[in-house]
Design a protein with these regions (language model features):
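Short, conserved beta-strand segments of beta-strand-rich sandwich/propeller modules, principally
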Residues: 339, 399-403, 511
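Substrate-binding cleft/loops of secretory-pathway carbohydrate-active enzymes
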Residues: 181-212, 234-238, 279-286
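Substrate-binding clefts and catalytic carboxylate motifs of secreted carbohydrate-active enzymes
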Residues: 36, 44-53, 216-372, 382-387, ...
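C-terminal edge beta-strand
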Residues: 416-423
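Beta-rich carbohydrate-recognition modules and glycan-binding surfaces
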Residues: 425-595
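Aromatic-lined carbohydrate-recognition surfaces of secreted/lumenal glycan-active proteins
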Residues: 163-187, 202-205, 223-234, 272-275
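Active-site mouth of glycoside hydrolases
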Residues: 33-37, 43-197, 209-210, 373-376
Length: 595
């Protein structure tokens, strides 16, 4: 063999490969231009680009098929590279968000160390992803100015510092910052204190139809992007006399999406918008903002946005709610009945299946990034129900919400709900089974927050997608050797060891079942229900466990017998514990349910 010729050949191959990689990693230039008529526009690779986008975790293939061209992130996660690659494959672009600390979450904008760390992180992220062809622009922060006047100068000066830094290292992508609407002095602050911010991103809901005019009245001159829009927020809705916010039906929400989009898009300063949210989300209720159900069915907002983005309606439209009405008063005495009448139909004439669910209402309505209350179905409340309505009787006092979901059976759905109140003292209510601690498609009211023992060695991935027992994900847990005893407990409330009220009445349950498997097989683990003793003010009314279970390499279902147990208040529904070990242990959990 001619060794010199061989080396030349290898060298040429390596150079060719590197050249290909450089080409593949080349940024697509994006410009921001203003025309003589006052209109602003993005140019991507020299061509006009109007953002037709959304944000959320639902399928990006469905998003591209719906006619959208962009999605946004709120921060830079470990999977951003994969998201950018998928976007490029699908012909989508990404507005990459850089999450900035919020003062209400403990971030101090007068703390030099915290600012330097945030600055360094943003710089590293920009350097890492600036040459990816799917990047459209950068978004610095999301509602980091807070909910008051939004005029804290040190926040805006830090944002200006970040924007100036990004412009030094990346000339290919415009920069925006995102605020919660435009009240207070937000517009003034961005315009006066942030000259290197090119675009104002605005999250707007009920106020979006009037936003373009209000922006001009505030002397807004920078182009803007509607970075979140959807139905009116809970803070914009007139509450009932007992303080509960009524929610629009999914059909009514779709009409609002259309109206809000058309008005905002008509502004010469608008560069596009992002519908919220491309997925499901529990915030205020289980259906307020989601454009999909947690089980994957689309709602009418998807149909409307598909028509707007693509210029044509989807072949299968969601069921239409023509009427959803509570008969009589929304406040009654214990034992009285509520009646709801429903008129729902499918545009294509498909038979519609209707599901009804009654839940207790939360004591407060959390928004944004606060830990959310999870609505759980109550048992033995609904007397009768059909596709025409429902009748229910609640034995005790409290505020409740009746949910209706209609399905066409081919991927479309519709939602409606109504808050109601029963006078008098709260009665002990039981929850409908099965109730999941962890399972795809189920609400999960307990958090895996109780990390115990030598927990520094632990890692937990709740969205592990390789070989789940069912659905799309399972839990992967790894304990890195060597370690002393360790474990994790699921809790309600999160991080509570018996000092706070919480938990659920699971009296109807006879067992807890779960599926588990070990990476190698033979892993010895204890599993149980209930940890908190009666010496705590708020304790688990039942405790039981399976000792030293030897896991198999293949999935196996296990069952914890709960017959005869007092399940009137379970705060710790599931836990596992491993004894000290000199070997790293990896195991998997799935489908943890009370039945």
């Amino acid at each position: 063999m001619n060794f010199r010729r061989y080396l030349k050949t290898v060298f040429a191959i390596v150079l060719t490969f590197l050249s290909i990689q450089i080409v593949l990693a080349q940024a697509v230039p994006v410009e921001l231009v203003k025309y003589d008529n006052g209109n602003w526009q993005l140019l991507r690779n020299g061509k006009p680009y109007f953002i037709k986008g959304t944000g959320g975790d639902a399928s990006k293939k469905l998003l591209a098929a719906a006619g959208a061209n962009t999605f946004r992130t709120w921060g830079v996660g470990q999977d951003l590279g994969k998201q950018l690659d998928e976007a490029e494959e699908l012909g989508l672009t990404v507005v990459v968000g850089h999450w900035l600390g919020h003062e209400r979450h403990g971030f101090d904008y007068s703390n030099t160390e915290m600012l330097e760390a945030q600055y360094t992180q943003v710089r590293e992220d920009v350097m890492k992803y600036k040459d990816h062809p799917a990047v459209l622009l950068w978004a610095i922060g999301n509602e980091m100015e807070g909910f008051a006047e939004g005029d804290n100068a040190i926040i805006w000066l830090h944002i200006q510092e970040l924007a100036a830094m990004i412009k030094e290292i990346d000339l290919n992508h415009p920069i925006m910052t995102v605020t919660a609407e435009i009240g207070g002095r937000r517009v003034e602050s961005v315009h006066k204190l942030c000259p290197d911010i090119d675009i104002m991103g605005i999250n707007s809901y009920g106020g979006l139809p009037s936003l373009p005019e209000r922006y001009k009245e505030l002397s807004g001159a920078k182009p803007f992007i509607i970075t979140e829009f959807g139905p009116p927020g809970v803070w914009e809705i007139t509450k009932t006399e007992f303080g509960a916010p009524p929610e629009l039906t999914s059909t009514e929400k779709a009409d609002f999406y259309r109206l809000a989009y058309e008005i905002s898009a008509s502004s010469e300063l608008c560069l596009g918008s992002f519908a919220f949210t491309w997925g499901s989300k529990i915030e205020v209720t289980s259906s307020w903002y989601g454009m999909f159900l947690s089980s994957g069915e689309k709602l009418a907002a998807v149909d409307v946005m598909t028509e707007i983005w693509s210029g044509k309606s989807p072949e299968n439209l969601c069921p239409e709610i023509r009427s959803f009405k509570l008969v009589g008063s929304d406040v009654v005495q214990p034992g009285d009945t509520f009646e709801i009448k429903l008129d729902v139909a499918d545009p294509e004439g498909v038979n519609v299946a209707v599901d009804w669910m009654i839940c207790s209402e939360p004591s407060e309505y959390l928004i944004a990034n606060q830990t959310q209350w999870v609505p759980l179905a109550l048992d033995n409340i609904i007397i009768s129900s059909s596709s025409k309505g429902a009748i229910l009787t609640i034995p005790g006092g409290g505020i409740y919400r009746l949910y209706m979901t209609a399905f066409d059976g081919i991927g479309g759905a519709a939602t409606a709900n109504v808050p109601i109140k029963v006078e008098g003292d709260q009665a002990q209510l039981r929850y409908k089974l099965p109730l999941a601690v962890y399972a795809d498609g189920f609400p999960q009211p307990w958090s895996y927050s109780g990390w115990m023992g030598n927990h520094e060695v632990l890692s937990l991935d709740p969205d592990y997608k390789i070989q789940p027992n069912s659905g799309e994900t399972c839990i992967k847990i790894r304990a890195r050797a060597p370690f002393g005893w360790t474990g994790i407990a699921w809790q309600n409330p999160a991080n509570d060891w018996g000092d706070l009220a919480g938990g659920y009445d699971l009296t109807s349950a006879t067992k807890l079942t779960f599926w588990a498997r070990g990476e190698m097989g033979g892993e010895l683990i204890d599993f149980g229900v209930g940890l908190l003793n009666s010496d705590k003010e708020f304790y688990d009314t039942a405790k039981t466990e399976l000792k030293r279970i030897k896991l198999k390499k293949k999935w196996k279902q296990y069952s914890i017998n709960l017959k005869g147990k007092d399940l009137s208040n379970i705060k710790t529904p599931f836990y596992w514990i491993i004894g000290g070990n000199n070997h790293t242990i990896t195991f998997y959990l799935d489908d943890i349910k009370f039945e």
